[in-house]
Curated annotation (Swiss-Prot):
Gene3D superfamilies: HAD superfamily/HAD-like, Imidazole glycerol phosphate dehydratase, domain 1
Listed GO biological process terms: L-histidine biosynthetic process
Top-level division of the source organism's lineage: Bacteria
Cofactor(s) in the UniProt record: Mg(2+); Zn(2+)
Annotated residues for binding of Zn(2+): 93, 95, 101, 103
Main location: cytoplasm
Protein name: Histidine biosynthesis bifunctional protein HisB
Cysteines paired by S-S bonds: none
Region (Histidinol-phosphatase): 1-164
Lineage: Bacteria, Pseudomonadati, Campylobacterota, Epsilonproteobacteria, Campylobacterales
Annotated catalytic residues: 9 (nucleophile), 11 (proton donor)
Amino acid sequence: MSQKILFIDRDGTLIEEPKSDFQIDTLEKLRFEKDAIPTLLKLKKFGFKFVMVSNQDGLGTPSFPKENFEIAHEKMLDILKSCGIEFQDIFICPHFENENCACRKPKTAMLEEYIKHELYDKEQSFVIGDRESDMILASNLGVRGLKYGALSWKEIENEILSSFRSASYQRTTKETDIKVKVCLNGGKVSIKTGIDFFDHMLEQIAVHGDIGLEISCKGDLEIDEHHSVEDVALALGACIKKALGDKIGIARYGFTLPMDECLASCAMDFCNRPHLVYKAKFKKSHLGALSTEMIEHFFYSLSYAMGVSLHLKVKGKNDHHKAEGLFKAFAKALKMAVKIESENLASSKGVI
């Protein structure tokens, strides 16, 4: 089974590399790079596995005795383990560059099993290192390389997470042309459906759900808003479902939210058994150019496209507040449900 793997360089990336001799052969030389450990802990929560790939020039020769190397190396691994970080595999090439061995980075001989058995997901795996050889290794593996030094560990974290749990989706019919982009870890918000009040409601999902959301819709508004609202819901739901991927680690569930004099509640379950229970009454037929009856239809279409069981209800006096409360409650429930809480799937069945 393909895994999300970070192939990580050691010296100069994970731990500081002494400029004097480029060898970490004493405990005094062992220092971690800033934010390396917290970043790896964060990425571990998102299901990434770690593989160390390091060139250690002349390891085992008189100039770099193996026992000296192992003292610092084992201490490093002990510290990482105490923090909750372990490497699935550790590959070390001990040769000098002029020996022209098959295993030295950027060659891939050390990773032959990973390549042969397709053990890493090329779309969701990365090489992290401080040298150009690491970037060439990334190219040889068919994954993206992130160069430490040009990027800090926090910037590397952001780069990885912005490409992870993200999706794009396009839905084109005779009635509408819709493009949606979702990043569940946050990002840009841009919504243009041609229905101002609907845009305002969709913005609540992005802002209060803390997600990046871009939606553009060209629809047959000269007829009415029905097709645009329905198809935006279908495209948005499909895009969120795509961004969630295998759903491993998500909380799965969530929320109740007061909105001025209103009380809106939303309960959500990413169970892949779509269902909607909706309890809301509006005095007005329209809010702006959006028919209030289309609010229920939006959530119905959205729940089926997302594959969620969705319970929504609101009570209050002001129709605008009630509508906004529903969208905000949905957003908060979504934020709670997609949050990574563990490394496991939240189901006793082993599948959602």
